[in-house]
Amino acid sequence: MTTKDPESEHPSVTLFRQYLRICTVQPNPDYGGAITFLEERARQLGLSCQKIEVVPGFVITVLTWPGTNPSLPSILLNSHTDVVPVFKEHWHHDPFEAFKDSEGYIYARGSQDMKSVSIQYLEAVRRLKSEGHRFPRTIHMTFVPDEEVGGHKGMELFVKRPEFQALRAGFALDEGLANPTDAFTVFYSERSPWWVRVTSTGKPGHASRFIEDTAAEKLHKVISSILAFREKERQRLQANPHLKEGAVTSVNLTKLEGGVAYNVVPATMSASFDFRVAPDVDMKAFEKQLQRWCQEAGEGVTFEFAQKFTEPRMTPTDDSDPWWAAFSGACKAMNLTLEPEIFPAATDSRYIRAVGIPALGFSPMNRTPVLLHDHNERLHEDIFLRGVDIYTGLLSALASVPTLPGES
């Protein structure tokens, strides 16, 4: 229930707001403050705390609750500590004050993405430990930097290190999205981010002339081809009510560059695109399509990748899979309606799945508008607290999954 008296605020909400006040905003996150906070949580909960610096200044913090059978693969609970920038002038309240209004809404950057989930992990573990529970499987909580700018100095490097292998993760949970309906969205895969820069070269000259074979003309052809593809995918999504956004490939033109003066036709121009490639797309064939679009535009048109992820994996969502059966069974026992989807953007789950670990993205926020990265990002305290209850049930089920075929 919503608490209007600050002195009677639920301790989990107080802890959540404390974490939100640590300004881990890109591009200069206070990672040190977050690590200190997590070290104190580990001390209070009686958990081991390991810090792994993957590159100078970028530390993965791992809190561990050992299971009764440490030979079994573990449960990995991942969350990122950084948050995206804000435009304070568009916020009703300071985005790093964690202001709670009279209705119980907590306004803060990271309230949905994804500090709520971090605290829900911690508070679920606290509750289970305080009740005297022990489970066969070890639970590791990883708190990683850099996710909001691609995870290249965070999870992407961490999964390649021996410290990650030592966790022996058998199944992972990570972030999802809010759902404005009564249902809860769970993500079993995600689209692959391709950031593509197309460069067109052509004949320069004085802008008063009809110059042939200009960079702009050829770049226009590529842009038209890509935007025509975009429209085709948009119509495919709109025509099928059963399709969700993550099931189609999206693309947006995000940057145009070129030119030195109004009266000079430039020799070089470029356009940058953000593709989010659906996981069922043939990646090699799609790259060849990009090549064809450039070739069809004329000589001197090339493309390069600023980011390219080509290892999409799908976590099984049928009851024959023991992990899905445990996850969905626990949700059913709590009377939760699940809507499995493909995540439309990118999270650190892609790196976890790419090394062969099944992962689901799940942020238990129903009846909540999707406000991640938006002005006035907020979460109601009742929704947050119910999320603690939900994760308590999920951890009990997942950490109790019996030995599977092939596990030692």
UniProtKB/Swiss-Prot annotation:
Zn(2+) 2 binds at D113, E148, H373. It comes from the Eukaryota. GO terms for biological process: amino acid metabolic process. The active site is at D82, E147. Disulfide bonds: none annotated. It catalyses: an N-acyl-L-amino acid + H2O = an L-alpha-amino acid + a carboxylate; N-acetyl-L-methionine + H2O = L-methionine + acetate; N-acetyl-L-glutamine + H2O = L-glutamine + acetate. Gene3D superfamilies: 1.10.150.900, 3.30.70.360, Zn peptidases. Its cofactor is Zn(2+). This is Aminoacylase-1. It comes from Mus musculus (Mouse). The gene is Acy1.
